[in-house]
């Protein structure tokens, strides 16, 4: 007779050991946790201990035991009731079924609820089948919506019905884990071919990982709109919170989180070697090497490594350009080196460290060109659904969209209504009532979808005594407002107030800077126990006596507001400020900006910060981009007060094929110096802008409904495909440009294909006028439900912006694309033809 399975037999001892270590470090917090664990079954208690052993300190401080109990109980039940789950390797079960955290989202109970909603739909399915079905359920409940940087909990995404890609994937991973399908979020931290990033989901079955688009169901795995885009990535990563790292290439850490390289599943890769040497030419062991891509006009890290005893660091990456920098500290002095490497043509590079203080010694300050190449489009995942699967999927997706749209129609957070409708019984409550709408109004749109009435009630009740002591706008925004940064909105005012005597409160009001002194003494930062982007709430800091630097700054604002002092984090640099004599003053003395940089724009380029230029300062062996606020060029001049030191200006011109023409300008500026620099954007030749992208076959319709293959339409020479949105400004612009150059475009009219939704579109004023002038243009029809998205994604332009314009040269060979309206599109099309 087979022995009964023992829950987490292989990992039991290390879980207990790590849990005891956490409890030893935070005894006050863990005493009540231990009491509650004694009331749990042995398996549930062990599951809870695993969560507590490997969660960030911020989670321990932010959330009550009952939140994690939901994850533990659901995980144990899955292990007991589902043989597929029980058969999983323990490390897979622990990290990708049981664990509560996906990335940096708010944590809330959801697993038991999701399992109840989904369970019956996947009865009898294997993991592969279940993953596909769960993703249809996710599409029924949520879709993409651009929002702010705070990451919603999975249950909040479900309730409001939308989220950005990072939130959709958090939601989908939780849904999958809730029914026992091992799942994780993966990220392209920065694309190389465009200024953006993306997150999606991987599921584990049959001993390997497969991917899917979160809330974007397909009939097969390893298929998503990003399949081609991911083949052009230089890095795709996953993360692990456990200290026992599974097999894979470690590409860096973020506090307690380990980042793993997942690129081989998506792109053609190679291993590169970086050798770092000191000024004497000897290997530099322990140098930090940062691998970076140019994105949003700054070099953004995608992986970090340390050199070995031979001074080398190795990375598996894609075939494109990387900016590689190295730094090392010796006897308190920082040394630095950097280069650009095209990994398609180079296997290794060498960096020689120099003192950062001598970075520009002897160098004439000038612009230096850098050509940045994006990897070529080379998908390694080429599976496609059959026509039958595609038809089935389209039908199901239409039904999912209808279900979701019905669900979210007129939806609002009932907690907001509850807060607004609270009964007013006393005179002092009548005053508070007048501020209820003000409090909701000062919150973000996202806050209003997941805020909790009881939390708002405490903030209102304890802030109201200060309402008459300052201007109303100041009171509402900087005293009443519960939101400081991107922290989880929770109660904290009552807990803060009870920590101080009446005398202490008055002393802190008289000199708010003393609040920071108290925080520095009482709250310890343990970065090795945190995830830098996960904030410990003010109440969590007080409970655990720990918090990151950002968490402590938020705590400062929270304490100040609780005591009736208007306070904030400066919106440009997150520095702490409180109001004194009607203006905000810094808590910590800022480094003096003792010199001035005058930037000249020239007359031909519209400069946009973090779009085509940026400036960074070299400190501690690393360039850090400045966070410019409302500074704008006036009369082609921008005056920037700076701290003295070494700087690097970057300008970048993103080409349609994803490559970039970059320009770098390194300079040193001395105290009291005024320096003038003219920004220079490198121009591109036509041949630099063209691509050769194989587009999928698609069908268009003639006026009588006959289907025509796009391969037939694009067979001979060059053509311009234009998907038009009649009477909308971007489409009107390009039509007007074409009519202004009527004679030139008339010569190519037979090679121009207008695609519209209906015959009625042809009767609108501008479009009918354009067709009258350019008589031989071909007209075809499509409902724009699918082809627009497919072609836009394939050509690496935004499919949500019309008109979509594609120039082809040969059968289904796209050489240029643009979407929306861009000045000069008409001229560009003529150049291409």
Model-derived segments and spans:
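A short, amphipathic beta-strand motif
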Residues: 270-281, 595-605
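Secondary-structure boundary elements
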Residues: 3-160, 390, 395-544, 554
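Hydrophobic/aromatic-rich core segments of domains that either
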Residues: 2-5, 116, 120-136, 145-156, ...
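Short Pro-Gly-centered beta-turn/loop motif in secreted/extracellular proteins
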Residues: 311-325, 329-331, 340-343, 632-657, ...
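Thiol/disulfide oxidoreductase modules built on the thioredoxin-like
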Residues: 784-830
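Thioredoxin-like thiol-disulfide oxidoreductase module
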Residues: 761-801
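Short active-site neighborhood of thiol/selenol oxidoreductases, capturing the structured segment around
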Residues: 710-735, 751-754
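Short, acidic Ser/Thr/Gly-rich low-complexity loop/linker segments typical of extracellular
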Residues: 295-317, 620-638
